[in-house]
Amino acid sequence: MKYLILSLLLLMSNQCEEKKEIPMQKQTTKAPFLWEAANVYFLLTDRFYNGNPNNDTNFGRTKKTAVLRGFEGGDIIGITKKIEEGYFNDLGINAIWFTPVVEQIHGSVDEGTGSTYGFHGYWAKDWTSLDPNFGTMKDLKKLVDTAHKNGIRIVLDGVINHTGPVTEQDPVWPKDWVRTGPTCTYKDYETTTACTLVENLPDILTESGKEVDIPVALANKWKAEGRYELEMKELDDFFARTGYPRTPTNYIIKWLTDYIVEFGIDGYRADTVKHTHPEVWLAFKKECDAAFVQWKQKNPDLVLDDNSFYLVGEVYGYGASNGLWYDFNDKKVNYFENGFNSLINFEFKYNAKENYESL
């Protein structure tokens, strides 16, 4: 009997050993990308990372500047290198917004902070070319492609409101393109839109419906660079396709949307939005959407998702508590009805100082 019991115990023991726990496999589903939930990293291109020290000085920009008012070396290659190193992925970033990289004025100015070059990117000289301090078109393509391979969207910064300041090296644009005064006083709609932000910052006549020619200085620049015929043909094609008049605004819309067609950037942050008429941005968004569709059709293997082009605006002073509207005192404007997916909430800098209970 005792041998029978021992045999049963051994049998049960062997059966227990044979039963192995099957590990539970976690089922993970990748969440779709939503702009409303994006983790956006903003950076000042010149101040982020110097990926190519060989492009740090161009156009004779060797004049001594005030402290931190000159180019410090950050560039497009530097951003790409940090993407490749996993810096952004480690932070959980899925969108990068960086300051403008178009060609800046060659001279320096003093707006009250000492001698300054256009290191920040908001003083455009030529919207059709990149500033060599920031990099080349090839560099930008690699950045966008690398970002997309890492699940990161790219938001460029676009300026339509103004050119760069006037210097000895950078002549003022023609009178049918810009106004040079008065300076904005921000009392109402007119004194916010039909004016210059500051002294010596020519304001594009974004409200103008008058057809204009390319500025002579810009045409001569293109000729010297050997690309005049190409640029003019592209302009002819754009205006023939859209039927738009050749106004200052429409030229710049064409130039900015070229970066979507060429590289497949995912969004624009629009600068100084409230200083132009809102209709400008509705037209801009329409062309951005068309350009994004065109890029997706030409590059089906590179498309990340079915999101449309994203446009966020800098309406300085706008706060989320105002709802859809920005108040000019004599007029309210709903920018969400004029092309924008979202606006920067300037109220947040004050909210951040409040305690949790008061929010």
Residue spans of the language-model regions?
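Sec-dependent signal peptide recognition
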Residues: M1-S7
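C-terminal motif of bacterial Sec signal peptides marking the signal peptidase cleavage site
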Residues: M12-Q15
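N-terminal structural segment of carbohydrate-active enzymes
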Residues: E18-R153, N161-T163, P171
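Aromatic- and acidic-residue-enriched segments that line the glycan-binding/catalytic groove
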Residues: T57-R61, Q104-A124, I160-K221, K286, ...
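The substrate-binding groove and active-site-proximal loops of carbohydrate-active enzymes
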Residues: T62-I77, G121-M137, P165, Q169, ...
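Short, acidic/polar
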Residues: G73-Y87, G243-E262
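Glycine-rich, histidine-containing beta strand-loop boundary motifs that form or position
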Residues: T99-P100, L156-I160, T272, V315
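Active-site-proximal helices and loops of the catalytic beta/alpha 8
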Residues: K254-L359
